[in-house]
């Protein structure tokens, strides 16, 4: 994650969260966040300013921060439950619904990534991450180094 962070927005996720007990999931989330802080890994932290942002934005972003790392359950299977079709995993002990907030943080992260925070995420990539990458590459080519790559030039 530390090597990716200068290039992309990092949002921590725990996949297959349905394989963990609630206690194991809470402990895993705590340990992941402790490691992120200990190793100073920059992650997208759903920023807000209490003085400038409206109450809804502050509340939503605080809630999203509290969910990190997101516990995700995925499935391609469609199961009918109570007359409605849902994406879920069927187990001998029951069903885990992908879109049920009690089972997974999928709805929260989907909403954040594709709706409420999409513009902010794109802006950070374009204005900050890409520009840093571009500056790094241009400065390497100016001082003659290629960052470990051999460059071939074709003379026309």
PLM region spans:
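Conserved GTP-binding G-domain of TRAFAC-class P-loop NTPases and closely related GTPase folds
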Residues: 6-156
């Amino acid at each position: 994650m530390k090597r990716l962070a200068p290039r992309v927005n990092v949002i921590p996720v725990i996949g297959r969260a349905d394989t963990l007990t609630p206690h194991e999931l809470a402990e895993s989330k705590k340990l992941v966040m402790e490691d992120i802080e200990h190793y100073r890994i920059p992650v997208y932290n759903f920023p807000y300013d209490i003085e400038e942002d409206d109450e809804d934005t502050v509340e939503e972003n605080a809630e999203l921060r509290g969910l990190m790392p997101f516990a995700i359950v995925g499935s391609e299977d469609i199961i009918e439950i109570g007359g409605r079709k849902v994406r879920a995993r069927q187990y001998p002990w029951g069903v885990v619904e992908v879109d049920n907030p009690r089972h997974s943080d999928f709805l929260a992260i989907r909403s954040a990534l594709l709706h409420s925070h999409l513009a902010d995420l794109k802006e950070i990539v374009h204005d900050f991450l890409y520009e840093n990458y571009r500056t790094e590459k241009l400065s390497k080519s100016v001082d003659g180094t290629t960052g470990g790559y051999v460059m071939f030039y074709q003379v026309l």
